């Protein structure tokens, strides 16, 4: 059975890095019975830090030692095939998907997760779990082989969702940008995840998790946006 935890963000307000979701991750690993297993960490989205720095930051902030970064393995694809749990950190989704394709890992990760290997990721790691990465918020742009992503969650994900416009900003709001995506991709569904929310996938069902009563938005072409409350579940 597919098991995944897709987190909108690594931080929530001023709680600090991974602090708001640390217990969610702990519970997820325990529920999936991999608490004592090694988690394969994929740091490729971390443009601003080295792979070693990213790995150590996650170990320190999660206070969890059973993490090994994929860059330390001589054969990345074999590391995925043998992984007991997989984690992808946030950062730049373009760079992340570029390297996942470069090392031929996209299909390997998808197959492992479909076979029941637990997967969790935040920000770019949640975005890339969707059907494509085309609702990312990211710059700079580095061209991956394809925008098709892991398809663990068979729809679009927009992490770090924030509603409305910043005072003095004359560009499009996030809602407007996502509506534009739907105009040119009319069969797609977008799930917009505010910071502090997550999707917990079990098989073909998903449940919204959240720090507060901040709903996930389900957006479809020429349809009214649906608000999915924390604690509610839906079919994939």
Tell where the protein language model's regions lie, with residue ranges:
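C-terminal and late-domain segments of enzyme folds
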Residues: 2-34, 46, 51-53, 135, ...
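Catalytic nucleophile loop
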Residues: 87-90, 113-132
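Catalytic-core regions built around general acid/base machinery
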Residues: 102-116
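A glycine-rich, hydrophobic loop/mini-helix early in the fold
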Residues: 41-42, 48-93
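Glycine/threonine-rich flexible loop motifs
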Residues: 93-103, 167
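Alpha-helix C-terminal capping/helix-to-coil transition sites in glycosyltransferase folds
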Residues: 81-82, 115, 152
């Amino acid at each position: 059975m597919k098991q995944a935890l897709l987190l909108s963000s690594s931080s929530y307000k001023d709680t600090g890095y991974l602090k708001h979701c640390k217990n969610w991750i702990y519970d997820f690993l325990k529920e999936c019975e991999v608490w004592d297993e090694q988690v394969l960490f994929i740091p490729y989205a971390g443009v601003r830090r080295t792979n070693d720095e990213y790995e150590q930051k996650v170990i320190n902030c999660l206070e969890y030692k059973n993490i090994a970064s994929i860059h330390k393995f001589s054969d990345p694809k074999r590391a995925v095939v043998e992984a007991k749990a997989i984690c992808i950190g946030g950062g730049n989704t373009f760079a992340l998907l570029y390297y996942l394709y470069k090392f031929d890992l996209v299909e390997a990760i998808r197959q492992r997760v479909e076979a029941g290997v637990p997967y969790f990721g935040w920000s770019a790691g949640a975005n890339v779990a969707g059907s494509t990465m085309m609702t990312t918020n990211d710059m700079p742009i580095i061209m991956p082989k394809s925008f098709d992503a892991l398809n663990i969650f068979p729809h679009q994900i927009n992490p770090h969702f924030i509603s409305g416009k910043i005072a003095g900003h004359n560009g499009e709001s996030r809602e407007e940008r996502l509506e534009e995506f739907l105009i040119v991709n009319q069969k797609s569904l977008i799930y917009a995840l505010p910071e502090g929310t997550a999707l917990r996938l079990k098989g073909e069902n998903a449940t919204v998790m959240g720090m507060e009563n901040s709903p996930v938005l389900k957006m479809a072409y020429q349809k009214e946006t649906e608000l999915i409350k924390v604690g509610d579940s839906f079919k994939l």
